[in-house]
């Protein structure tokens, strides 16, 4: 099984990915996590340090693939989860998608790409070009990490569009959304009501998850010395169980930008008993013609 994890930048994809990887390993699977971000910090909480990237290793070998060994690029982290960082081109130059392709090519050369039960691609923020959608070419399922906010759901909708496009030529499905760092899910529910897709799990805002990232550990590793954290691990184990059940997945149909803006803006600008106190911006009048004009201006 190959998974690609996407979501708005800063939404907690890497932390979520690492904990899902451990959860899958706890279920007896051999797991490889591939970080697909030039920051090369995806696997930090698995290994405890920033591992060398594949691109750095290839450059050091003058791109002679035959001189690269598995131990040069694959590092085993906590829970026996193997880790790879694709790395990326210098800022403002090159293509991140090309780097992902080179990573997969090298792993195949090393006969490592097919040795795992699960390969998880942790991809940088929003899909802004076809290059960063490259991991979808290899994935069976896409997971989208979001929160209960406007920006994250807008980014999720763009990723949904990429999944739909890639599904035309690849056996790719959207496994569903993972809500992260949110005690509410009203906006998420509003979105999936109009754009049907599964919601796999919703994790509340838990300080210990943030602390785990700072410490360079997964929640599972921290729970070894603090059993009070076991309930957090259960969230990720639930996600793993659903994925291992081979979900049918969906080929979603994204909303048009204007439709999504209208849907979410109307929700934010209308106070109801359901969203009273749940959104940061609550105005006592619904979306008016003036508001619609402002929306038109935003979307120009």
Swiss-Prot record:
Cofactor(s) needed for function: [4Fe-4S] cluster
Residues where Mg(2+) binds: 14
Pfam families assigned to the protein according to its UniProt record, in alphabetical order: Fer4_NifH
Positions that bind ATP: 10-15, 39, 180-181
EC nos: 1.3.7.7
Broad enzyme group: oxidoreductase
UniProt-listed InterPro entries: NifH/chlL_CS, NifH/frxC, P-loop_NTPase, Protochlorophyllide_ATP-bd
Origin superkingdom: Eukaryota
Pathway field: Porphyrin-containing compound metabolism; chlorophyll biosynthesis (light-independent)
A Gene Ontology biological process term: photosynthesis, dark reaction
Residues annotated for [4Fe-4S] cluster binding in this entry: 95, 129
Principal location: plastid
HAMAP family listed in its UniProt record: ChlL_BchL
Family listed: Belongs to the NifH/BchL/ChlL family.
Quaternary state and interactors: Homodimer. Protochlorophyllide reductase is composed of three subunits; ChlL, ChlN and ChlB.
Protein name (Swiss-Prot/TrEMBL): Light-independent protochlorophyllide reductase iron-sulfur ATP-binding protein
Native species: Chlorella vulgaris
């Amino acid at each position: 099984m190959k998974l690609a994890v996407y979501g708005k930048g800063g939404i907690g994809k890497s932390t979520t990915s690492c904990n899902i990887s451990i959860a899958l390993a706890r279920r007896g699977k051999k797991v490889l996590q591939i970080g697909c971000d030039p920051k090369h910090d995806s696997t930090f909480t698995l290994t405890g340090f920033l591992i060398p990237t594949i691109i750095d290793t290839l450059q050091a070998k003058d791109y002679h693939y035959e001189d690269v060994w598995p131990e040069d690029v694959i590092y085993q982290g906590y829970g026996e989860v193997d880790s790879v960082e694709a790395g990326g081109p210098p800022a403002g130059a090159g293509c991140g998608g090309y780097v992902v392709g080179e990573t997969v090519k090298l792993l195949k050369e090393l006969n490592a790409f097919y040795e795992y039960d699960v390969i998880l691609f942790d991809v940088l923020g929003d899909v802004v070009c076809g290059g960063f959608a490259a991991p979808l070419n290899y994935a069976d399922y896409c997971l989208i990490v979001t929160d209960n906010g406007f920006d994250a759901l807008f980014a999720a909708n763009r990723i949904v569009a990429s999944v739909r496009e890639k599904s035309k030529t690849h056996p790719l499905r959207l496994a569903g959304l993972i809500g992260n760092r949110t005690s509410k899910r009203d906006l998420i529910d509003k979105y999936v009501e109009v754009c049907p897709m599964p919601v796999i799990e919703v994790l509340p805002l838990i300080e210990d998850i943030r602390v785990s990232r700072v410490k360079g550990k997964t929640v599972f590793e921290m729970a070894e010395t603090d059993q009070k954290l076991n309930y957090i691990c259960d969230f990720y184990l639930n996600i793993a169980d659903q994925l291992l059940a081979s979900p049918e997945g969906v080929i979603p149909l994204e909303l048009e930008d204007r439709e999504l803006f209208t849907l979410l803006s109307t929700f934010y600008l209308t106070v109801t008993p359901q969203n009273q106190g749940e959104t940061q911006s609550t105005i006592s009048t619904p979306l008016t013609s003036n508001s619609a004009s402002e929306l038109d201006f935003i979307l120009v």
